[in-house]
């Protein structure tokens, strides 16, 4: 049964149509990889789900919350409730530099969920342990690698106990050698049963972790199926062309 449905979502930036009538149904436990060319609306789609971007047309249905678009002032409480239940991990870490890892993870629990400091600390420590950083709880972001900072950001999201986790290119700001530790963390939380939507250029990772893959181009979903169907047997010429180019990029330029 779907816990999230997007219906006829449209989003433009001036004359540039970024999302052009998106329909998407997400079931509990889905791990949906979102792939496609750069600039085709992948990040905008994620940001539209929790209304960081505000579509001009459509409807968002999340369990018992229905939000018609464009947004009206009377729906502000619904937006707040939606954001409490959908967590997001961004390309950048957005950690507070003057707070420790533990304090960063506790922040939303105290300010948004109104937890007591004692309960917030307990939940934050559990989340840091989940991403392998409990021992780093008293370190400040400046003393941590980019990969560790992103894992703290993931812990911050998980501590809020979201129903859905959105991940927007979570490794794009990292040095190549730090990518693996973050992907390993994402794989571990996926195995815990979270419902996830992941935008990433790490195609091999997306193909292995996802239960379902959608391919966006020109603001439309033109492929939607299992990883095998989309990556190996795409139906559209555009997806075939895209994956052929991606495969060529992985081929060595020369042989010794």
What is each model feature region?
Residues 159-163:
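A short, proline-enriched helix->beta-strand linker immediately N-terminal to the Walker B motif
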Residues 140-144, 148:
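Conserved ABC ATPase signature
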Residues 165-168:
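Catalytic Walker B motif of ABC-type/P-loop ATPase nucleotide-binding domains
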Residues 224-225:
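ABC ATPase "signature
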Residues 67-87, 117, 230-234:
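ABC ATPase NBD coupling module
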Residues 50:
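Helix-to-loop junction immediately C-terminal to a conserved catalytic motif
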């Amino acid at each position: 049964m779907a816990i999230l449905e997007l219906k006829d979502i449209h989003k433009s930036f001036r004359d540039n149509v970024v999302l052009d009538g998106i329909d998407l149904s997400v079931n509990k436990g889905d791990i949906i990889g979102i792939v496609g060319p750069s600039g085709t609306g992948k990040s905008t789609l994620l940001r539209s789900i929790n209304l960081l971007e505000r579509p001009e047309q459509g409807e968002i249905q999340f369990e018992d919350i229905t939000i018609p678009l464009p947004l009206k002032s009377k729906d502000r409480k619904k937006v707040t409730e939606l954001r409490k239940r959908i967590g997001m991990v961004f390309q950048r870490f957005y950690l507070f530099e003057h707070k420790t890892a533990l304090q960063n993870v506790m922040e939303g629990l105290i300010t948004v969920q109104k937890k007591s400091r004692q309960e917030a600390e307990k939940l934050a420590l559990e989340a840091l342990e989940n991403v392998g950083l409990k021992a780093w709880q008293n370190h400040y972001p400046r003393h941590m690698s980019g990969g560790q900072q992103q894992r703290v950001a993931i812990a911050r999201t998980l501590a809020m106990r979201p129903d859905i986790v959105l991940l927007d290119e979570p490794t794009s700001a990292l040095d190549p050698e730090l990518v693996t530790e973050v992907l390993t963390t994402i794989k571990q939380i996926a195995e815990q049963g979270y419902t996830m939507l992941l935008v990433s250029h790490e195609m091999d990772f997306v193909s292995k972790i996802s239960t379902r893959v959608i391919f966006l181009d020109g603001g439309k979903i033109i492929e939607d199926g299992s990883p095998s169907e989309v990556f190996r047997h795409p139906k559209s010429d555009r997806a075939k062309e895209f994956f052929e180019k991606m495969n060529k990029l992985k081929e060595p330029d020369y042989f010794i």
